[in-house]
Amino acid sequence: MPDDQREPYPFLPDVPRHVQIADVLRQRIRDGKLTPRMPIPSEPHLTEEFGVARDTARKAVAILREQGYVHTVRGMGTFVRARAEWLIQ
């Protein structure tokens, strides 16, 4: 299927979308699909992947930051923290 005809992400109706996106990214981190020091997808990429507004993607990343899974370096991006760092948060 071409990228411009991608199936919409199957969001649950009773859970805010930013929470669901954070859950997906957190699972990718836990599964090792996103590894320490690796950048997570950019906000524009997340908006395209999940079909949401940029503010929704930003809120999802903020949840992960608050939980200690990622940290942001201004002008460089948002990166996965080492496992030991997110376990103690």
Question: Can you say where each PLM-predicted feature lies in the sequence?
Answer:
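Extreme N-terminal segment that seeds HTH/winged-HTH DNA-binding domains in transcriptional regulators
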Residues: 1-52, 59-62, 66-71, 76, ...
